[in-house]
Amino acid sequence: MSQKIRIKLKSYDHMLVDKSAEKIVKTVKTTGAVVTGPIPLPTHKKLFTVLRSPHVNKKAREQFEVMSYKRLIDIYSSSSKTIDALMKLELPSGVEVEIKV
């Protein structure tokens, strides 16, 4: 059952993404599978511009930004033990996990 598993992690907090990636890599390595990563993917920055005043002063604006951080982990030569370990793994609620087999 040797197959490639690709895990993408996405979050607004880079510390959560790094901790989750570290946890996944450590868990997979204990099962004996080969891991590449975590590979940092480009950071996406979304910028919001709003008026400071609700009525006048178009020149007075404020900008807010939301950064999303992504990491990629590839797992090779995985076994059923690896998949079971990944299913039981508890990750923080602020991390979005996408798994492709």
Swiss-Prot record:
Return the GO cellular component terms, semicolon-separated.
ribonucleoprotein complex; ribosome
Q: One Pfam family, please name it.
A: Ribosomal_S10
Q: What processes does the entry annotate via GO biological process terms?
A: translation
Q: Which UniProt keywords apply?
A: Ribonucleoprotein, Ribosomal protein
- Note the SS bond partners: none
Q: Which domain of life is it from?
A: Bacteria
Q: Does this entry carry the keyword Ribosomal protein?
A: yes
Q: Which PROSITE patterns match?
A: RIBOSOMAL_S10
Q: Name one GO molecular function term.
A: structural constituent of ribosome
Q: Does the keyword Ribosomal protein apply?
A: yes
Concerning its family, UniProt says: Belongs to the universal ribosomal protein uS10 family.
Xref: HAMAP family: Ribosomal_uS10
Report the NCBIfam families cross-referenced here. Answer: PRK00596.1 (NF001861), rpsJ_bact (TIGR01049)
Q: What does this protein do?
A: Involved in the binding of tRNA to the ribosomes.
Give the quaternary structure: Part of the 30S ribosomal subunit.
* Protein name per Swiss-Prot or TrEMBL: Small ribosomal subunit protein uS10
What organism does this protein naturally occur in? Answer: Flavobacterium johnsoniae (strain ATCC 17061 / DSM 2064 / JCM 8514 / BCRC 14874 / CCUG 350202 / NBRC 14942 / NCIMB 11054 / UW101)
